[in-house]
From Swiss-Prot:
Top-level division of the source organism's lineage: Eukaryota
Topology in membrane: Peripheral membrane protein
Family of the protein in this entry: Belongs to the eukaryotic ATPase epsilon family.
Subunit and partners: F-type ATP synthases have 2 components, the catalytic core F(1) and the membrane-embedded component F(0), linked together by a central stalk and a peripheral stalk. The central stalk, also called rotor shaft, is often seen as part of F(1). The peripheral stalk is seen as part of F(0). F(0) contains the membrane channel next to the rotor. F-type ATP synthases form dimers but each monomer functions independently in ATP generation.
Keywords: ATP synthesis, CF(1), Hydrogen ion transport, Ion transport, Membrane, Mitochondrion, Mitochondrion inner membrane, Transport
Organism of provenance: Yarrowia lipolytica (strain CLIB 122 / E 150) (Yeast)
Annotated GO CC locations: mitochondrial inner membrane; proton-transporting ATP synthase complex
Protein name (database record): ATP synthase subunit epsilon, mitochondrial
Keyword Membrane tagged: yes
GO biological process, one term: ATP biosynthetic process
Length: 10
């Protein structure tokens, strides 16, 4: 899992 995935891939 990547940081942008955790953010909600906006």
């Amino acid at each position: 899992m990547s940081a942008w995935m955790s953010a909600g891939f906006s």
